[in-house]
């Protein structure tokens, strides 16, 4: 980010910058740090020594391109070479070689990595920063108990607590605690040093009994006492080296390694001057912490707010990759030790190259990217989704919180989040508040803190010289920070104005001359998702949250369209997403087609730019680039060459501007349902393309290898019509549900005994040979119909059972909008399409145009997302005047009712220019009288009409609709399975049963709870009677779920039986359940 001398100018940082900086820091610093920690390895006789040299390492440029890595399901990585030396101590000779120690997955231009052909991204984690924190809690008597918690770099905790008698204890486990004197002595201090280094020696002496003196008489005694309490060991343990090692490993290593950040925090909190390279907890730290705790007890010092961002640190991509590199080197160390021992045992002469294998590093990174909770598959639904995913911040993950243990205070917005973490953008559900999003201008500092930029105002002029500062959360408490920018203050004389400001986590109104810093940008506090919502200041925050989440679910449409009303950030989002093709140098277009653009560069060299053609994203949306330049045109560096999915002219374009009326229509927009015109279907307004991938593998079985073939016995020729001579579906074929995509036969042993006797007799009469293979073809599942656009046959070298051949078939589907699809605006106004009306039946305007969509007006007042009304009316004015608007939020800071004035003035101008008085009617501005398409009569009340930007979301009915006639049943309850993927059934739950009971439909209810559910015999009889014909017999015994309940009660020693009462003589007939 740059700040020049001009008033309030700045450039928005690259949205992928956080990821790039993290990866660069890992390559530049993290690798060297970890290699320098690699120990010298010696053999048992200490004759040979192996070591790695940190000065020189080399990353080789990848051999394969990104696209090839994705297509072939390989990892886009670079080979790492390090210098290693082998020293023979007897002859003092050294052999040095450059050795290959493994592959490191590289980051591409999108800030993501490609592992096994899948785009993956590492998200940043928020952890409690290592250091010391003071808190107080009320005990059962209502007395404040003060504690000091030391958190290590590994997340281990050591608690110091002070009791009523001012004695200080260190809690070593949940139940055990030891005196602070014993802990200090065990760490190497004697009593004299302890008393010299504390501020309150008399308090320490007050609880020094004879027993205590004996415990701290020597270091050995203190360690034994500490070990007894820590390990809960009875008797008298004997001091030994192994006992010290156990304590070191289980206690000191986990709870006393502070790290670089922890040392800095403890020095700052306790006013110590211990060198930064001393990353372990020292007796001086413990004693200073105890002094501070005594001060707290007597009312001195302040308690810590654990949720303040100054007490948090960001574990970035660099830290996670460095941790994994250290883990891989530890594994490599064990391998080298084993190899040296083996070489000496077999009397072989080792070389550095022979001792090292690339497996530990390569497998460590592959398992990290594949299994670690913070490494996620990149969501590529649309360009916005790709960018936002890399800017997530998570409290979850290893060393962090879980969705069930995190309390409300952690999830809540904190004043220190201002300008660093977006107060709006978070996930809904159990993880609300635990997964956040970085604010636009926030960056990660050197110490793992989140920094936000501000303009510094100098005392003399308050505006002449402006300098940009990045402040960490611990720094900005000391400044008065004005929330507005100078434009908002220019309405009057600045010196006389009171401005809203922030000081010490409070929001105040202060005089302009008292301000030290001011904000640099109206969007500074929001994430990218929230910054794309126009008029966000008029919306309730809950709806803004939904909107920022739903924009990430928008499907790229076949013909994208820019929004009329936007915020100005659309261009930056599109450019940083990497979806449009951008010229890397200036030149002249020599050739262009759908697959590539050829550009002449400096001199005679030409540059070929390949375009993405119908590429599948991991959400099955279609990624496609369309050339925007003509042959012979001269272009400049940075110019848009081709638009991608959901971008137009280099701007983000997720939806469509369509004509909308807010009115009820025959109950079809009840409860957020949406009524649409058939024009949206036939005009392909909301048509999108989806690409599905189907894959099959061939294995080598015990009976022999599987075969790909077109000759499949027992199958109709109709199903095999699209296969070529190899048995694979042909490119361009139209395929329907059930068609064979790849023909495959699996060998099986033919056993005569497995057939029924009459089957064997028939085979003998007709001379039919017993089949030696069974058909295991790849068939197109339900809902998969479409056009085959690509077929890939991936053959690994040396095709074994471990390296099977893979055949992939890609099928493109064209999906128009239909009943059951989900649409949404940019203000959290979402709905399901309930009916598609003929255009002649839709309500129409005074100029005869039918509206495209009808929303329910009751969805606005209760949800308080009034921004949609402003956008709707301004969109109508923009479409009539052929204008586009880019509006920054919080425009009311410049003038009262600024948004309303802008909208009404634009509507008035549109009314004048188009000579349509109905566009702006002074009695009800923004509303208009419209007519019923069925009768031609005007509606009773004027209705608000406009052109908002409406998105089609990825929750589509084609992916959700599902039916079942019969299928699999659960083994225990004998009820149908749940879910579409398992061909499951519908559950008739408690409330559904009540609804049916309310209508008295006893027979339907009985069917649903027996034949259609878990009555095994009745199920079979129903099948028989429906085939043969006849009446369905009534089930007499209980269904399986009732029998399961009886068995579960019996396991609790409760026996349950039921009785049948005779209708004639009311005799009880006992019958066993």
Curated annotation (Swiss-Prot):
Pfam families: RNA_pol_Rpb2_2, RNA_pol_Rpb2_3, RNA_pol_Rpb2_6, RNA_pol_Rpb2_7. Keywords: Chloroplast, DNA-directed RNA polymerase, Nucleotidyltransferase, Plastid, Transcription, Transferase. GO terms for cellular component: chloroplast; DNA-directed RNA polymerase complex; mitochondrion. It catalyses: RNA(n) + a ribonucleoside 5'-triphosphate = RNA(n+1) + diphosphate. Disulfide bonds: none annotated. One of its GO terms (molecular function) is DNA binding. Belongs to the RNA polymerase beta chain family. NCBIfam families: PRK00405.1. In plastids the minimal PEP RNA polymerase catalytic core is composed of four subunits: alpha, beta, beta', and beta''. When a (nuclear-encoded) sigma factor is associated with the core the holoenzyme is formed, which can initiate transcription. DNA-dependent RNA polymerase catalyzes the transcription of DNA into RNA using the four ribonucleoside triphosphates as substrates. This is DNA-directed RNA polymerase subunit beta. It comes from Aethionema grandiflorum (Persian stone-cress). The gene is rpoB.
